[in-house]
UniProtKB/Swiss-Prot annotation:
The modification Phosphothreonine is found at residue 330. The gene is SSC1. Its main location: mitochondrion. One of its GO terms (molecular function) is ATP-dependent protein folding chaperone. This is Import motor subunit, mitochondrial. Its EC number is 3.6.4.10. It comes from Saccharomyces cerevisiae (Baker's yeast). Keywords: ATP-binding, Chaperone, Hydrolase, Mitochondrion, Nucleotide-binding, Phosphoprotein, Stress response, Transit peptide. Component of the PAM complex, at least composed of SSC1 (mtHsp70), MGE1, TIM44, PAM16/TIM16, PAM17 and PAM18/TIM14. In the complex, SSC1 interacts directly with PAM18 and TIM44. Interacts with NAP1. Component of endonuclease SceI (endo.SceI), which is a heterodimer of ENS2 and SSC1. Residues 637-647 have a biased composition (Low complexity). It comes from the Eukaryota. It is found in: Mitochondrion matrix. Changing residue 651 to G: In strain: D273-10B. NCBIfam families: PRK00290.1, prok_dnaK.
Length: 655
């Protein structure tokens, strides 16, 4: 455990800085493709001169389903061929696996997905959620890799040459582990992922490439599996993200599931047959639900016809149901409502009101839903822009960023942000922030800390992510130990802790003992990170418990100071024992004992009266000052008496 020790505030060390170099300074050789690795569909684009182009796949489509299937013949299918055979091979057809990237098997979202997909989600030996097909287990990153490879092959077929470098997009609210897993997916198939770019930021790049005027743009990105809202300031080629928010488990897949459940429920009511465990039937209904959802964006009603969905003793059963747009909107209203709070929080974090927003861009297939468009219009007080293609903007933006990295496009600077605050645990379980949420990245920040006990030769650095004042209310994302610190009194060693976040949002934390230059570090990439509920809860709780957290933090900090005062006073009493008034010394000892008991209660997590702690600290401070002032006076008087005696002897000698 570390004891926070801001030595003269260490402003030169603890100020963060933005690496705002023009990105073309790190040029790469050859073409850099841009890939939108989506939950439902993926796309690939390339820059041709100054014009970005979406590349059609082998089937002639501009987007490719993010679906991977394994046939009984041992063949692996990706994209449209995989999706076509899903009904006859549901348990070996993997889709929406992006939602599993970087997640632990025990995560609530994973447990929910287990009940909603026909394939097996299993627990890997490291605790992560993996998938199983044909008796073989795969990491979600591997499945993502197969889709990335399909995008790579699509680009190579068009360009007529091998492709090695890519920019891949991720949801803005992806945590460190999910970003790292996305880079791993590229590496698996031999792609050098030069940059991981947030999806709404990429869409803004696509929108603002040829625009020189200054605008504040909101990107509302509701895709197949995730929702992001980002506020950007676009000014003459500089794209600066002001804030971001979102939900990593909200998208078109959820709308499909809501409609699927309604169909299954109606069918059960009509026939008494529960289709929930019939994987083939559920897959047919899932595909029909997706198709109906899409149709209801352009028509006011649709019909779902699925003949021979099942059979019982009386014969075959069919599904024949009608759904109106109004019914679908009522059914999915809770999902649409979940987009509202993140928008409000993003505006608040950016310090802006809706009147400050120049344009609202709609991105992601679900943003076509009329109710979503209506909600966005209501939130921002203006019609959203149709300047970008919701399905293609992200891949185009990734291609723009790729062209920046290769030097084909100049004078474009992208400044993104980290979505949640980062810091470490300090004495008393306090969350000490080093990098606040919505800090522009890349960024680096250092701060000096010290030991919490005398003779401490190692410290454990525990890295947390969140918005609460105490670590117990935030998310542990990594920890490591710095050993080999020379034994010294409590608070003497100077340990410099540095957070370094790269342009991909991946975190490196290091600690260095300034006396010996020994250091230790960790790249925070092994944890499964935060669920969307945890992120939303963190921000809500941070507001709800702000005063309570602040009071608790103040109590801990006061207790730490009180403990230091008690120890210092106790040591001084021992040093000057016999030179101070015994009664006064005992009074001070009693105050030390009383104060230490109160401090122990605070450090044990007990709620104590902050005023009582403050009063007892001040009383000890006053008593100890009086005692040692008297000691100083006594010493001064003794010195004066000695000097007078010496002067008298000197006078006698002269006579």
């Amino acid at each position: 455990m570390l004891a926070a020790k801001n030595i003269l505030n260490r402003s030169s060390l603890s100020s963060s800085f933005r690496i705002a170099t023009r990105l073309q300074s790190t040029k790469v050789q050859g073409s850099v493709i841009g890939i939108d690795l989506g939950t439902t569909n993926s796309a690939v684009a390339i820059m041709e001169g100054k014009v970005p182009k979406i590349i059609e796949n082998a089937e002639g489509s501009r987007t490719t389903p993010s679906v991977v299937a394994f046939t009984k013949e041992g063949e692996r299918l990706v994209g449209i061929p995989a999706k076509r055979q899903a009904v006859v091979n549901p348990e070996n057809t993997l889709f929406a696996t992006k939602r599993l990237i970087g997640r632990r098997f025990e995560d609530a979202e994973v447990q929910r997905d287990i009940k909603q997909v026909p394939y097996k989600i299993v627990k890997h030996s490291n605790g992560d959620a993996w998938v199983e097909a044909r008796g073989q287990t795969y990491s979600p990153a591997q499945i993502g890799g197969f889709v990335l490879n399909k995008m790579k092959e699509t680009a190579e077929a068009y360009l007529g040459k091998p492709v090695k470098n890519a920019v891949v997009t991720v949801p803005a609210y992806f945590n460190d582990s999910q970003r790292q897993a996305t880079k791993d997916a590229g590496q698996i198939v031999g792609l050098n992922v030069l940059r991981v770019v947030n999806e709404p930021t990429a869409a803004a790049l696509a929108y603002g490439l040829e625009k020189s005027d200054s605008k504040v743009v909101a990107v509302f990105d509701l895709g197949g599996g995730t929702f992001d809202i980002s506020i950007l300031d676009i000014d003459n080629g500089v794209f600066e993200v002001k804030s971001t928010n979102g939900d990593t488990h909200l998208g078109g897949e959820d709308f499909d599931i809501y409609l699927l459940r309604e169909i299954v429920s109606r069918f059960k009511t009509e026939t008494g047959i529960d289709l929930e465990n019939d994987r083939m039937a559920i897959q047919r209904i899932r595909e029909a639900a997706e198709k109906a959802k899409i149709e209801l964006s352009s028509t006011v009603s649709t019909e779902i016809n699925l003949p021979f969905i099942t059979a019982d003793a009386s014969g075959p059963k069919h599904i024949n149901m009608k759904f109106s747009r109004a019914q679908f909107e009522t059914l999915t209203a809770p999902l649409v409502k979940r987009t509202v709070d993140p928008v409000k929080k993003a505006l608040k974090d950016a310090g802006l009101s809706t009147s400050d927003i120049s344009e609202v861009l709609l991105v992601g297939g679900m943003s076509r839903m009329p109710k979503v468009v209506e909600t966005v219009k209501s939130l921002f007080g203006k019609d959203p822009s149709k300047a970008v293609n919701p399905d293609e903007a992200v891949a185009i933006g990734a291609a723009v960023q790729g062209a920046v990295l290769s030097g084909e496009v100049t004078d474009v600077l992208l400044l993104d942000v980290t979505p949640l605050s980062l810091g470490i645990e300090t004495l008393g379980g306090v969350f000490t922030r080093l990098i606040p949420r919505n800090t522009t990245i890349p960024t680096k920040k250092s701060q000096i800390f010290s030991t919490a006990a005398a003779g401490q030769t190692s410290v454990e650095i525990r890295v947390f992510q969140g918005e609460r004042e105490l670590v117990r209310d935030n998310k542990l994302i990594g920890n490591f130990t710095l050993a080999g610190i020379p034994p010294a009194p409590k608070g003497v060693p100077q340990i410099e802790v540095t957070f370094d976040i790269d342009a991909d949002g991946i975190i490196n934390v290091s600690a260095r003992d300034k006396a010996t230059n020994k250091d230790s570090s960790i790249t925070v990439a092994g944890s499964s990170g935060l669920s969307e509920n945890e992120i939303e809860q963190m921000v809500n709780d941070a507001e709800k418990f702000k005063s309570q957290d602040e009071a608790r933090k103040q109590a801990i900090e006061t207790a730490n100071k009180a403990d230091q005062l008690a120890n210092d006073t106790e040591n001084s009493l021992k040093e000057f024992e016999g030179k101070v008034d015994k009664a006064e010394a005992q009074k001070v000892r009693d105050q030390i004992t009383s104060l230490k008991e109160l401090v122990a209660r605070v450090q044990g997590g007990e709620e104590v009266n902050a005023e009582e702690l403050k009063t007892k600290t001040e009383e000890l401070q006053t008593s100890s000052m009086k005692l040692f002032e008297q000691l100083y006076k006594n010493d001064s008087n003794n010195n004066n008496n000695n000097n007078n005696g010496n002067n008298a002897e000197s006078d006698e000698t002269k006579q």
